[in-house]
Structures are given as structure tokens and as C-alpha cells.
């Protein structure tokens, strides 16, 4: 019971109470200055983004270089516009491009030659070329949808039109998987899938299992097929929700005591071919010392 409580506590820490998901990695003006780049370029220019990620990794003694610094990389391809708040300088999607899910056209294949996604892939290549291990975070189906329409519309569809959510979710999951495969080809060493927009605690257990969990499991399976030899780490909000809904089973994998979480991910990813899907941890903890010497291997049901 204590172990279960800890898992759920971690999931709540990683989840967001706001309408939009939290930033993937926090980047600051100071980090950009140390990297010799402009703050704005950390979001839109590949080499600048890579230099910022490297500076952040060096400052935090993080064994991983984590990308990107914006949650709108995938959603931008379907109409979301990233803006930097004039006062806080925090990147956000200010206005939703659609009012309803029904207004959205089909999700066409991503164009890897333009926008933020092009810059991210360029950054991955640059970091790989310089000998760094890159963790790339993929936004989950529901997080992307909530940047295109309001979260209220997404939840409304989950309750009232689950068939539409499953259909649009399958389309979007395939696009996410294509992005994952391209990122690995560019040099990403670890993938992370984050979807804190939908929480197990905000819908009924049956609805989560039959709709949200089904959509998420489908997306995870597609990503795994696109990058079968690369570790995929699920954020705690997602992995704990799947386990509670009986969509996945978690198993402790012992690691050397005293490791940073990022070190453990690297070692398990290199040495355990049977452990390519993990969860119950958060990629933002990469530079932090693990309290318990375990990685949680996940098996989807």
C-alpha cells in the first residue's frame, strides 16, 4: 500500500492543474545567456536549442540532454501557435485554433522540414554529434488535443462521444509514432511520452479504462513499433493511470543504489533489452538522486 501511495503521489506531482500541460523542460534567460544564444531562439532554432539543452544539462549535472522546451511542437503542425508571454517569457499557446473536435480536419503526416519540429530534430542531431544522450519528450494524444481545442471540449468528447475520441486518437497516435521514429533516426537515445492532461482521478475508472486508457495504450504501442530498440519512458501521471485501470502491469527492476534517475534510464536502456517500456518516474527528475534503487518496467495488457 505504501508503494502504491508513493506512485500516485509522484503522478500527482507530475500532473498539471492548468488548462494546458506544463513545459517539458524549464529554460531561462540565464541559461540562454550562458549558452551564448537568444532566449527566443531556444524554441525555434535547432542549434540554439541544442546549446541551451547542453547548458541546462551542465548546470544541473544532468546525464541527459532533454528536449524540447515547448509542449506545442506537434500541435503547431495542426494550427497551434506558440507565443512567448511578454511579462513571464513563458512559452504558451494563447488561442485555440478550433472550437470543437468536429471542426478539426484529419491529422495529416507531420512535416519534419518546417516549424518547431524541424528545429527539435536538428537539435537532436547536433547533440548526438557532440556525444550527448538525448531524451526527447513526446506529447501525448490528449495533451496535443488540448492545445487545439479547450480541455473542456476534450473531456466532453470523452464522455459524450468516445468513438470520435478513439478515431481522432488513433490518427494522432500514428503521427506521434512517425515523429518518434524520425527522432530516433536523428539520434534520440530515450523517448518519453507525457500526457498529464487526462487524469485517472478526473473520470470514472470504467471510462478511463475503456476510452482514455485504450487510446493511450494504442499510442504507446504505435511508438514502440516505430522505435522498438529505444527506451520509452511514460510520465507518472500516464503510467500510474494505466496501472490503476488495469491497462498495464509494473515490475521493479533493480539498479545500482545512489544513481541519478537519468543515469538509471541510460544504464537500463543499454543493458536490459527486455526493459524498453518504463514508467512511474518523471523525466524532470533526471538530475536527481533516486530514493529507491528501482526502475519500473511496464507491460501493457
What is each model feature region?
Residues 81-179:
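Active-site-proximal, glycine-rich beta->alpha crossover segments in alpha/beta enzymes
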Residues 3, 38, 42-49, 109-116, ...:
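Residue-level preference for long, well-ordered alpha-helices that form the structural scaffold
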Residues 57, 127, 176, 183, ...:
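Conserved, mostly hydrophobic/aromatic
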Residues 188-197, 230-241:
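A short glycine-rich, hydrophobically flanked beta-strand micro-motif that places a catalytic Asp/Glu
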Residues 1-84, 209-231, 243-301:
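N-terminal basic, low-complexity leaders that serve as flexible interaction/assembly modules and, when applicable
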Residues 72-74, 81, 135-157, 186-211:
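Active-site-proximal loop/short-helix segments
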Residues 93-94, 115-132, 205-229:
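Alpha-helix-loop-beta-strand connector modules within alpha/beta enzyme cores
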Residues 170-190, 217-219:
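Alpha/beta enzyme core
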Amino acid at each position: 500500500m505504501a508503494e502504491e501511495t508513493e506512485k500516485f503521489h509522484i503522478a500527482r506531482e507530475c500532473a498539471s492543474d492548468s488548462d494546458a500541460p506544463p513545459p517539458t523542460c524549464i529554460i531561462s534567460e540565464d541559461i540562454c545567456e550562458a549558452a551564448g544564444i537568444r532566449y527566443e531562439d531556444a524554441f525555434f532554432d535547432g542549434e540554439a536549442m541544442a546549446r541551451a539543452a547542453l547548458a541546462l544539462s551542465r548546470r544541473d549535472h544532468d546525464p541527459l540532454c532533454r528536449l524540447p522546451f515547448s509542449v506545442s511542437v506537434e500541435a503547431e503542425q495542426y494550427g497551434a501557435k506558440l507565443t512567448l508571454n511578454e511579462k513571464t517569457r513563458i512559452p504558451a499557446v494563447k488561442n485555440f485554433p478550433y472550437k470543437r473536435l468536429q471542426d478539426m480536419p484529419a491529422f495529416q503526416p507531420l512535416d519534419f522540414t518546417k516549424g518547431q519540429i524541424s528545429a527539435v530534430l536538428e537539435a537532436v542531431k547536433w547533440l548526438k554529434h557532440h556525444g550527448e544522450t538525448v531524451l526527447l519528450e513526446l506529447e501525448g494524444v490528449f495533451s496535443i488535443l488540448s492545445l487545439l481545442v479547450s480541455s473542456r471540449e476534450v473531456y466532453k468528447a470523452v464522455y459524450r462521444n468516445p468513438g470520435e475520441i478513439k478515431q481522432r486518437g488513433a490518427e494522432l497516435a500514428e503521427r506521434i509514432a512517425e515523429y518518434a521514429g524520425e527522432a530516433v533516426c536523428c539520434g534520440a537515445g530515450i523517448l518519453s511520452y507525457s500526457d498529464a492532461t487526462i487524469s485517472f482521478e478526473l473520470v470514472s475508472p470504467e471510462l478511463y479504462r475503456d476510452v482514455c486508457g485504450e487510446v493511450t495504450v494504442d499510442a504507446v504501442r504505435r511508438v514502440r513499433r516505430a522505435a522498438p530498440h529505444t527506451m520509452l519512458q511514460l510520465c507518472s501521471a500516464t503510467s500510474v493511470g494505466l496501472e490503476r485501470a488495469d491497462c498495464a502491469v509494473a515490475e521493479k527492476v533493480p539498479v545500482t543504489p545512489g544513481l541519478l534517475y537519468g543515469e538509471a534510464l541510460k544504464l537500463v536502456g543499454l543493458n536490459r533489452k527486455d526493459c524498453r517500456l518504463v514508467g512511474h518516474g518523471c523525466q524532470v527528475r533526471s538530475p536527481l538522486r533516486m530514493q529507491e534503487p528501482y526502475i519500473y518496467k511496464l507491460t501493457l495488457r
